[in-house]
Structure formats: C-alpha cells, structure tokens
Amino acid sequence: MNKKIISNNNAYPRFLNQLAKDLSKFYYYKLSKKFKVQNKIKGKGYDPVTTADKAFEKFIRFKINKKFPDHEIIGEEFGYKKSKSDYSWVIDPIDGTRSFVIGSPTWSNLISLNYKGNPIYGLANFPILKKYYYNQSDKVAYVVENNKRKKISVNKKAKYKDLKLAAGLHGAISLKKQKKITKFLNLMQFPCSDALSYAQVCEGKLDVVFQCSNKIWDIHPLIPIINASGGIVSTIDNRDAKFAGNILASSNKNIHIKIQSLLKPIAK
C-alpha cells in the first residue's frame, strides 16, 4: 500500500462518505418497494441477482464517472470499464443478495478504490441498518451510525480461549473436508452475515471471521477498513486477501496464525 497516496488525498474518503448517503437515499426513494429476481445459474443451484443490484451498480458507476472519469471500474454486474489509470474502483452493488431478497437487513453496498490493484480505500454501506463503515487513512477507520461518526478498532486483547468467531462455509467445503477441521468448527459461535461480519471484527464485536469463495468485489472494499482498524486479513493459505477466495480476518496476529493452523487441512 502506498501510504503517501493514502495520507495526502482526502478527496476519496469525502467522496465515499457522500456516496454512502446518496446510496441510502437512492434505496429508499427508488428500490425499497419493487424489484425482480433472476437466478444466474442455469440448472441446479441458486445465485440470485435482482433489478436492484443492477440499478445500484448503474448509480455507483454514474457517481464515479462524474467525479473520476479517467478511473477504471470493475463491477459484479456490468464488468470492466477499461482505463490506463492506475486507479480502479471495485463494486459489489448488493453484497448479500440472498438477504436482500428475503428482507433481511444485513445486505450492503461495497465499493473500494484500488491503486495499481491494491485496495486503499473502502466503503461498506448498510442502508437498512442506517450505518456505514469506511477508512479515512491506512491507520484510521470509522463507523457512521444515525449520522454520528465513531472511530473503530479491533479487539486487540482478544484471546484464543474466549474467541467470538463467525464463519460462512456457503456449501463450498464438503462434509469430507469439514471432518478435517473439527477443532475449528467447534469454535464457531455465529453464522456469517456477509460484509457485516467483517465490519464487526473492525468494531471489536467479533474476533475472527472466516468466509469461503469470496470474489474480489466481496473482499476488496473490506480490506482497507480491516487494516485501518488494526486487524489482519489474508487468505487461509496466507496469500494477500486481494486475490480473494477463502478469507480469514482476525483481530490480532497471534489469533490469525492459530486459526490458520486449524484451517491448514483445507487450505489447498
């Protein structure tokens, strides 16, 4: 991460702050009542996409193009807008579409700004919960709830013996493989709520989150917020989280290493 870029440019956090507010207004004015659902998977399986996903992404792209017309954009629903710029935006218009479809409030809008492929600023906006998370710099992250801003930090004092751990396997790990990580499974206390669980690590409410099969738009917007709040995030085989996949986020390094060791049998 280029710390000079992070520290010298407040335009991006300001933009993300305003975007969060605009997205919440857009939802309540345009999308809260009617939407259509399609299944992306033909045949067996269920991967829903809604007209709201597409409307949100169009809105986010419009805002980015208006403010930063030369930047590249990568979105879950509409793909790539190519550019020669070193800056790119990664968009998940609705993270937790299944939650959105059934009326659960835990879905979010996720947006990151990347520099040369590395996430440097992130936003996780939760319109129904009336709050959003973002990083101001590489060392400072905030939650804004009911228009009140509060600096957030992971629980650095968390210990292995009393972990608060959430996990989402999403059917990605077979029962055969799950039998290899029974010590980890016995530590699970909470189900994952998509991006909200990562955000709760940043606030110190959870100590560990493990999620399978993350795409770049699922995790890139969370990486800068996790790092800025003092957390650790990587793949379970200790690669950079920007490569996505099976992602582990922890409140401190000792816990991270310990949980990685428990997940080692399924890391390859």
Descriptions of predicted regions:
Residues 83-142:
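DPxDG-like acidic metal-binding loop motif
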Residues 27, 31, 53, 64, ...:
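Residue-level signal for inorganic ion chemistry
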Residues 1-94:
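N-terminal subdomain of lithium-sensitive/metallo-dependent phosphomonoesterases centered on the IMPase/IPPase/PAP
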Residues 114-118, 128, 137-140, 146-147, ...:
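Short loop segments at secondary-structure junctions
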Residues 54, 77, 93-96, 127, ...:
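Generic detector of well-ordered alpha-helical packing
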